[in-house]
Amino acid sequence: VEMNNLNKRMGELRGIDANAGVWARVLGGKGSSDSYKHKFTHIQTGFDKQSHLSNAELFTGVTVTHTSTDIEGKIGSTNGDVKSIGAGVYATALFDNGFYLDTIAKYVKNNHKFDYAFKEMKLDFKSQQYHTHSFYLGGEVGYRFNLGSGYVEPQAEVIYVKNSQANLADNGHKLTIKASNGLVGRLGVNAGKTFEIGQSKATAWAGIGYQWDIAKRNEILVDGISASNSKKDARMLMDLGLNIRANNKLSIGLSLEGSVFGKYNTDLSVNSNIRYSF
């Protein structure tokens, strides 16, 4: 949910001629694996300054986020929710030759409320409330090939995430959620077509991609014994979207995403964003 994506975060930036802008984004959806179901709502807003360079448009800004996540495990497994708040900075460059580069760094504080169950050990850790800290660093690059009123845009993205450790206890037993590090990659391609709706311009687009864990290290210990060690995962992403430039200042976007072939998949997510430039 906290992962970055330029188009979903701020919509279509090409063609904007302004000095600054404010934007907001709402992402909601659900996902699942063999062992649990996952619902999420992510709200993000930001402000940026637009700089007109000799060969590019540069957007530099700040962002704040709030995320609500609910996890429902199978009977006798882990259940709970996470409420997160975060803040970050970003820089996006759109070059005249079609190339673009987006970078973001973000800090997130996570407040957890969970019931943990380890059936093989016959141990439960009930009503555990604790917080952790996460740091995200991401970069996305792509190139837009313009084809008349349409385009094809290959993309590549990598995100590093670091989570802090949590130490819990219940009924004389200790539960340690070790600090974790992860590196997630994404390769994909979007294709779109621009057309007019009255006085507005709209771009309908579709995308397909492959997301995978390049590196992943996380582990849960119960009384010093390893009880869980998540393995790497990968999935295919599929997207449909519509970006509308209502006028020179206002733009909105809507997209749908799902994934397949992963141990965990997004069943459906809906992303909407709005931007006002001035």
Model-found features: residue ranges?
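Short coil-to-helix leader/linker segments, especially the first N-terminal amphipathic alpha-helix
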Residues: V1-K8
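Membrane translocator/pore-forming domains, dominated by Gram-negative outer-membrane beta-barrels
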Residues: N7, I16-G21, R25-F278
